[in-house]
Amino acid sequence: MNAFPLSAARAARILVVGDIMLDRYWFGEVDRISPEAPVPVVRVARREDRLGGAANVARNIVALGAQATLMGVIGADEAGSRIKALGAEAGVNDALVIDTSGMDTTLKMRVLGRQQQLLRVDFEQGPSPQALQRLHDNFLEIVGAHDLLVLSDYAKGALTHVETLIQAARQAGVSVLVDPKGHRYKRYVGASLVTPNRSEMQDAVGRWDTEGDLTQRAQALRHELSLEALLITRSEQGMTLYTQHGRQHVDAQAHEVFDVSGAGDTVLATLAVARAAGLGWYEAMVWANRAGGIVVGKLGTSIVTSQELST
């Protein structure tokens, strides 16, 4: 396999738009059960915040050597401030919209004991119509200055009007990669690539009986949405790509699966950088598959660097 195209990636300008969240981790030790209820008591020893959702996609893009601009909606709160600070530290260009209507920035707090997740607490609230309008207006101003658009949909509200974003990007000559959510796939019509996982694909086309059945359903969906390509991420079964040239598959490369959270973000980021660097869909899938195999061996939402991919 050829080396990762780092020199070409450095010139790539990728715009990431979607649902932004903060992943907060509390690490500790468990050595007793609470006398108040039959639950473990975690003695917190370390705290860590990481970029999540679309922000994790942008962070992975930068780690792979490309330029990333992050656009989405955050609240005027502590979690939103942390996202801005962490993005700056990672080298992500900031095009965030701050919702001053009282919106809570999406925050996922995980409590871990002995490297095992014991509890997750979510704080989330959708953006206001005014914030979404500002997001749309800002998007129209900057999308044409980028080589590729990535849409990271976690169904938190930032991509409520995703159809207009895709249309504007294609009119500007910008390719669009989408990580979808839900079963309303007609929202993504006109995108270049959609990357459902196995469960999301079942939501979109129903259960399949054989690989031949899946191929028929996948190609029908690709034609219906006018996609160049459809890529299904299938966990331990690898990845399968569908284009006008047919079906192509790569087997999974993970040696040990430790944590799958954020793995889809890394896969999407790698696909985006590889495509922006001039690689074809199949080559991009091979690199994304390798990146996915690396990141699931790490704890929590993590990144994969170009150096890791090339070794």
Features from the language model and the residues they span:
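Conserved N-terminal subdomain of the carbohydrate kinase-like
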Residues: 5, 11-14, 23-148, 302-311
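Structural motif
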Residues: 15-17, 120, 147-150, 177, ...
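Active-site metal-binding loops of divalent metal-dependent hydrolases
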Residues: 19-20, 154, 266
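Short glycine/proline- and charge-enriched loop/turn segments
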Residues: 32-42, 195-200, 248-253
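Short acidic, glycine-rich surface-loop motifs adjacent to enzyme active sites
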Residues: 145-158
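Conserved phosphate/ATP/ADP-binding segment of small-molecule kinases
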Residues: 156-247
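Conserved post-catalytic alpha-helical subdomain immediately downstream of the catalytic base
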Residues: 228-229, 253-311
